[in-house]
Amino acid sequence: MAGFGNFTENGSEFVFTGTQTPRPMLNYIWNPRILSGVNHFGGGDGAYGARSAAYIDPEGRGRSSLFRGGNRYFYIRDAETGEFWNPGWYPVKRTLDRYSCTHGLGYTRLEGAYGGIAAGARVFVNAEDPVEIWTVTLTNESPREREIKVYSFVEFSLEGYARYSEYNSYVYCDYLAEDDIIVAHNHAQERPHEWFDGFAAASVKPTGYETGKRAFLGNYGDTDSPGSVVRGACSNSLAACEDMVGVLEHTFTLKPGEEVTYHTLWGAADGNETARELTRKLLAPGRIEDDFARLLAEKTAMTEDIAVQTPLAKVNHITNMWVKQQVLLCAEAGRATGKGFRDQLQDAWAVSAFLPGLAKEKIRETLKYQYKDGKCVRGWLPLDPHIYSDGPVWIAPTVNAYLKETGDYAFLQEQVPYLDEGAGTVWEHMLTAVRYSSGDLGEHSLVLAHDGDWNDSLNGIGTGGKGESVWTSIALYHALNETAELAREVIRDEGLARELLELAVRIKEAVNANGWDGDWYLAAYNDHGEKVGSHTEQEGSIYLNSQTWAVMSGLAEGERAGQCLQAVDNKLDSPYGPLTLSPPYTEYNASIGRLTGFVPGIWENGTPYCHGGTFKIVADCVAGRGNEAFDTYSKILPDSAANPSDHSGCEPYAFTNMYFGPANPRAGETAFAWVTGTAGWMFRAVTQYMLGFYPGYDSIRIRPCIPEDWEECSMKRVYRGDTYLLTIRNKNREQCGLKRLTIDGKEIAGDVFPIFGDGLTHTVEVDM
């Protein structure tokens, strides 16, 4: 386990007590107008505008990249000795007497001490303003009076658009002396909007400032020893046509035991007057602490309605706290490439359990990127018009899950525009999607792949218009069944339900006839009619997704379902989770896709790609394999016993997209965390598939699937205004199902009971 920190008792915070991590450990803070990453040193980047998890913007997002290169630090300087240091250790890297960094849900707090001076810095953003709000505290812990200077430093970027001329030709800084505000301007004509200015301000009057990076660092200086800090004085520079910074120097004389607190603001603006308005608004007495209290209350409300208690504290902490924050980030900020059609729908599926209003908003937003004929773009921000075969199949399960969570059936009749022309109800969007995919079939009566499927890097199988995806066909079978269920139970159209089920049967027959390879399902046929994911291939002979989805969708039945899972166990297992495929490719094959050109053991080429691994957990639960489900969960879990964060580099509180695979020299390491569909599926894997709380239209099904060594676990589940207290007892060391179900002290037959709808608390007791 990680040797550099630990969770607090309730898991809402992770406290770093050591600086020597494999890479900077990130937290994210955001609102609709700003997104910032804050690492355990206090550094990080920030951006203004349309939220996307990428900081370096390609053309088309209209975002301003506020802060450059992670350069956002506080320097503490002793006037007597000239020594200086950072509360977060980096970049000066002076050995501190005391250090900690606390990452919470939407905030970070640094605390450091050196030479009798303690310094703390807390950062968050409020609900509405494009400003990082830092609260700095200095304490004199020594027995004598001390003069201390604090230098708050941020480097402005102010980029994020296609440039046709030199950036530095348009940039300069103002210092608004009457308010002591630094404003960095970018007036380039190519800007898509006016919000490409940055500003720095504070609640106490500074004793100096710098706005030019060269002036602050010195001609050959760096962030580990900035010239202004070394000298102990700023030059009050005004930058023009050069790299810009916002540095405010504050000088304090502290008696023994004395403490001082002040606030620093770093944010975005569209000119001097906006910078003034934001500064005055946020620095009004009591405003910052009121905003912080609102943030804490918001996070409490988000986390308290679904809370699990399992034998493992880390599972509880991540499920109850951190994975919800991670899914929220994914839903609101998208991914590094923007907002993906499939990604946003899967995020909506997850958050519908604890933020149903956001789920509804995300479904609406995503459906606007569906064409009238039913196909969907890959994503937006910026618009990616590639047609991946899987877009349409995610609509039905997501909308269905939202309806089962909320009972908001009127949503089906809400009008949402199509991307190209016209509009349709949500229900019409769903029907159009499954009908499009059901008719978009190739030679083997399987769904045409086009630019790829869920596996983005299978982008060579169908570009010629003939390749077919076995996995998308299986996912279509699942989507058709979900749509048919809605048609029968909510729309009350039995004829339509039969039509959809007939389509599902045809797809199932085609997959079983043409997609079965003898011991497992193929991944695809390419444009040349060649099998992808076949035992006849030396590389990429088996793919994970077709096997897991065949089981979880019910397409594979009986012996064949068992063969799928056995193949996964025997051929795709690894210490870090199930592999996307095996063996990894070593030679590029354009008729399969870019993944064949990747170094073995990265991205989709033979890695424990965690998002795909979550499908395996669900498949295990559907098959009643509680031990195997939790084994896979444990391998994907960050900072696991087999792959601690000291090695993987993954934040101990956030799921990663993938671990490097066994064929890679970096096996078990991670490239990044936070922005991944893994989070939503891991949340659902625990709260729905493992602890077994399945929402329905007018009922609840209880079907736990847990490891046999869990003697007891429980969950609080607020659902449609009622509170259900679920307790699962497993004295018989079972893995799935139940022997007895008791509701409010009364034993009932079966595993389904009606939704109460009375707003009260009800006990649900399970004996396995």
From Swiss-Prot:
Is a promising biocatalyst for the efficient enzymatic synthesis of solabiose from sucrose and lactose, in combination with sucrose phosphorylase and beta-galactosidase. One of its GO terms (biological process) is carbohydrate metabolic process. It holds the Pfam family Glyco_transf_36. One of its GO terms (molecular function) is glycosyltransferase activity. It catalyses: solabiose + phosphate = D-galactose + alpha-D-glucose 1-phosphate. InterPro entries: 6-hairpin_glycosidase_sf, 6hp_glycosidase-like_sf, Gal_mutarotase_sf_dom, GH36_catalytic, GH94_Enzymes, Glyco_hydro_65_N_sf, Glyco_hydrolase_94. The active site is at D456 (proton donor). This is Solabiose phosphorylase.
